[in-house]
Structure formats: C-alpha cells, structure tokens
C-alpha cells in the first residue's frame, strides 16, 4: 500500500499507523484459518472488476477455493489470472481486521485437486474436520459436485493487512 506521508487520524504519520496495525505472518495465518469467506475480484471481459464472495480454505498454506467451471469468475481467471482477494471481519472500527491478497490464480480441473480443495472448503464451511467428512461418506458427494468445478489456488504477490484492535 502506498503511504501518502500525510498525518493519519490522531496526528501520527500514516506509515507509523500502518506499521502498528499490520498483522504478523503468524497473525495472518491465524486470521485466515479462523475465517471462511473471501471476496474475490477478477477482471471481467470489458476490463471492469467482477466481484464475488466464496467460501475458502487454506490448502498447502495457500488460499484456495472451488467454483463452477462455467462461472464468470472461472472464465475471467482463464482469460486473465490476475486476482485480488479480501478476507475481513469486525463490525465496529476497533474490531476491524482484514487481509488483502493480490496475486495470480492457478486454476485446475484435475479431479484429485478439485476433490482436495472441495473437501477442505466443505470442512471449513461446516466446521467439520476433513477426516470426519471422509468418515461420514461425504467423499462421493464432493466428487459429484466437483465434476462441474475447478479448483483455484492463489499465488500471493502482494498483501496488505490491518488489525484495528492493535490501536
């Protein structure tokens, strides 16, 4: 994020305030693990942003989600893999936390990868351990749902984070 150099709220410099609220790598990982919805911005065919909200999971340490292969976001990502993702939470100013990830989407229709991401996302959505999903017989349902989907992994190139509870 660019720093304007102008004093921020409370009279401090923007750079100092930004450093104060930036999450550490450990805080970022904990934040991503604790949340489950991400806003995904792709580049539409006319160059305008296309936004959608999806459930996600961390798979191999990377933000990942699955989506219908024919969805606008999947079509956009095949044409132009640039993506910005936003995970945020909090209601009041002092509670606001967020992580913006700008990067490249790596999309695959490999059935095993789609199943792996689908299982992780389903576990995150339901609050159920992946092993328990498998034991409950969810694998077949996830594989059926995955036939029309692709898995998307986000390769981070730039991030910005904030945690107003640090103020």
Please place each PLM-identified region on the residue numbering.
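Short, conserved active-site entrance elements at the starts or edges of catalytic domains
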Residues: 14-42
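Structured helix-beta-strand junction loops
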Residues: 34-35, 79-80, 148
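Short beta-strand segments in beta-sandwich/barrel cores
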Residues: 38, 63, 83, 105-106, ...
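A generic structural signal for nonpolar/aromatic side chains embedded in well-ordered alpha-helices
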Residues: 32, 76-77, 121, 154
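Short beta-strand segments
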Residues: 36-69, 77, 84-88, 97
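Charged, gly/pro-rich active-site loop segments
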Residues: 2-23, 93-167
């Amino acid at each position: 994020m660019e720093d304007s150099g102008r004093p921020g709220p409370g009279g401090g410099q923007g750079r100092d305030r930004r450093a104060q609220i930036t999450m550490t790598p450990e805080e970022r990982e904990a934040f991503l693990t604790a949340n489950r919805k991400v806003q995904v911005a792709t580049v539409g065919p006319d160059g305008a942003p296309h936004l959608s909200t999806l459930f996600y999971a961390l798979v191999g340490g990377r933000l990942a989600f699955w989506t219908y292969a024919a969805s606008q976001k999947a079509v956009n990502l095949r044409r132009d893999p640039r993506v910005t993702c936003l995970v945020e939470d909090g209601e009041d100013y002092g509670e606001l936390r967020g992580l913006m990830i700008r990067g490249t989407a790596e999309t695959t229709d490999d059935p095993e990868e789609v199943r792996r991401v689908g299982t992780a996302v389903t576990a995150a959505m339901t609050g159920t351990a992946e092993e328990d999903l498998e034991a409950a017989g969810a694998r077949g349902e996830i594989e059926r749902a995955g036939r029309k989907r692709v898995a998307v992994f986000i390769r981070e190139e730039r991030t910005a984070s904030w945690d107003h509870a640090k103020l």
